[in-house]
């Protein structure tokens, strides 16, 4: 199931409250400030810090 892009207007990173960006290639929501990637499960964002994946600089979307 795909993410409803309209959600990006109303949800934020639970850590810094910053904007999240959708990485369509890996189906994750990315916080560029905290370098965290939140998974999607059946199109639903899982915005739990303990479920986030730490990104390295090579994985950061431009």
Curated annotation (Swiss-Prot):
GO cellular component: cytosol
Disulfide feature: none
Domain of life: Bacteria
Matches recorded under Pfam families: Trm112p
InterPro entries: Trm112-like
Entry similarity comment: Belongs to the UPF0434 family.
Name this polypeptide is given: UPF0434 protein ASA_1553
């Amino acid at each position: 199931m795909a993410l409803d892009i309209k959600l990006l207007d109303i949800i934020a990173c639970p850590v810094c409250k910053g904007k999240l960006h959708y990485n369509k290639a890996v189906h994750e929501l990315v916080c560029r400030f905290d370098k965290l990637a939140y998974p999607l499960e059946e199109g639903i964002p899982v915005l739990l810090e303990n479920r986030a994946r730490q990104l390295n600089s090579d994985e950061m979307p431009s």
